[in-house]
């Protein structure tokens, strides 16, 4: 899989831009604040209809314009497929093969991407919400039904929280409704938990040997999905019974707080090196090796799930890695994955992958191919 071309209309600082790409490595070279990251963000939006930088759709639309538009053509399974995403003040519209998609969950998954940016280094050491968002993005693009389930979960969670808030305020409401919402909540929660736990298990299978190699055989990586339920066995009904029992035990506490206290929206992923928690005890080098291993594992996992390698986006991350990790990253993707790199300079990066790259010079919203 690779992105053949992209057209941007009124997206960020690009009023009218058309580019054709190499199926191997493409480098966006330029000073800071010229629009390099905006180009990678456009590719990410074309793939996931979401950004790694903002959740406010208005940020994408050029000042005093009505809408932003991205068009791309991808080569996938021997076919050339046009994608289109329009962003207005009211929301998003998406098309595949010129056919409008009723839901974004039907659109996502046509173009698979893996992004590695400086903020992804906080995937290991940052707050649990960062890791939950990572799971949602990665599972969602491989299993679009997951996005539908996630949307349903968020809807029921919101309803349940509203009801708990009413009970907290001593309003006269039917107490049976809380039990009904809790049952619905548990069904969807276990669905998400199962998909997340399965993903983590597969991710570890790829990430562990990569980490072992980067650490020169000195470190063993383990990844654990820390769920609200006890993940004994493989029977979701057992998990659901455990969740319902726990929710019943904290029912009064939830009413007192007016909020749902357990569920996938509170779950986390934990990383261990040689048995020690990386978040708490890992050095900066170990945390970076873990993040790099996870990103490289994503590439292989997406290939396993979809039959195609994803597009890799490296947003100014090479400068955050030392020479050894740079070399391992570029060596792992060489000749295998279409890659987009943003950087202020390629000097000091001595690797054949970049020397053979197609370079685009970016300055004040203009892009020139070398």
Swiss-Prot record:
Q: State where it is primarily located.
A: cytoplasm
**A Gene Ontology molecular function term of the record:** ATP binding
- Name the domain of life this protein comes from: Bacteria
Protein name as annotated = DNA replication and repair protein RecF
* Annotated coiled-coil segments of the chain: none
A biological process (GO) of this protein is:
double-strand break repair
> What species does this protein belong to?
Listeria monocytogenes serotype 4a (strain HCC23)
Keyword Transmembrane (UniProt): no
Q: Name one GO cellular component term.
A: cytoplasm
Q: Can you tell me which residues bind ATP?
A: 30-37
Family annotation (InterPro entries): DNA-binding_RecF, DNA-binding_RecF_CS, P-loop_NTPase, RecF/RecN/SMC_N, RecF_2
Described by its record, this protein's role is as follows: The RecF protein is involved in DNA metabolism; it is required for DNA replication and normal SOS inducibility. RecF binds preferentially to single-stranded, linear DNA. It also seems to bind ATP.
Question: Which keywords does this Swiss-Prot/TrEMBL entry list?
Answer: ATP-binding, Cytoplasm, DNA damage, DNA repair, DNA replication, DNA-binding, Nucleotide-binding, SOS response
Q: Report the gene name.
A: recF
The record's HAMAP family line, in alphabetical order, gives: RecF (MF_00365)
Q: Family per UniProt? A: Belongs to the RecF family.
Localization annotation: Cytoplasm
């Amino acid at each position: 899989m690779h992105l053949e071309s992209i057209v941007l209309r009124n997206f960020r600082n690009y009023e009218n831009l058309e580019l054709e790409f190499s199926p191997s490595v493409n480098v966006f070279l330029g000073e800071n604040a010229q629009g390099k990251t905006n180009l990678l963000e456009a590719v990410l939006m074309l793939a996931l209809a979401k950004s790694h930088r903002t959740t406010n759709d208005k940020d994408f639309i050029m000042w005093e314009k009505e809408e932003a538009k991205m068009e791309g053509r991808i080569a996938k399974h021997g076919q050339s497929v046009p994608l289109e995403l329009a962003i207005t003040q009211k929301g998003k519209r998406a098309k595949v093969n010129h056919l409008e998609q009723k839901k974004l969950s039907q659109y996502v998954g046509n173009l698979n991407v893996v992004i590695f940016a400086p903020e992804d280094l906080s995937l290991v050491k940052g707050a649990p919400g960062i890791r939950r968002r990572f799971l949602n993005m990665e599972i969602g693009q491989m299993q679009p039904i997951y996005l539908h389930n996630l949307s349903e979960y968020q809807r029921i969670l919101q309803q349940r929280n509203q009801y708990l808030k009413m009970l907290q305020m001593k309003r006269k409401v039917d107490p049976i409704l809380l039990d009904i919402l809790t049952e619905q909540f548990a069904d969807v929660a276990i669905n998400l938990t199962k998909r997340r736990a399965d993903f983590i298990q597969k991710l570890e299978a790829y990430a562990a040997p990569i980490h072992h190699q980067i650490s020169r055989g000195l470190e063993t990586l383990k990844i654990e999905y820390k769920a609200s339920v006890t993940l004994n066995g493989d029977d979701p009904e057992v998990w659901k019974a455990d969740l319902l029992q726990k929710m019943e035990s904290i029912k009064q506490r939830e009413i007192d707080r007016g909020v749902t206290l357990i569920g996938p929206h509170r779950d986390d992923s934990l990383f261990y090196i040689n048995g020690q928690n990386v978040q708490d005890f890992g050095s900066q080098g170990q945390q970076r090796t873990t993040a790099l291993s996870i990103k490289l594992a994503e590439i292989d996992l997406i290939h396993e799930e979809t039959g195609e390698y994803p597009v890799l986006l490296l947003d100014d991350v090479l400068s955050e890695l030392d020479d050894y990790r740079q070399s391992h990253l570029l060596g792992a993707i060489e000749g295998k994955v279409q890659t987009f790199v943003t950087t202020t300079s390629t000097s000091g990066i001595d690797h054949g992958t970049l020397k053979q790259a197609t370079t685009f010079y970016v300055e004040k919203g203009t892009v020139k191919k070398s």
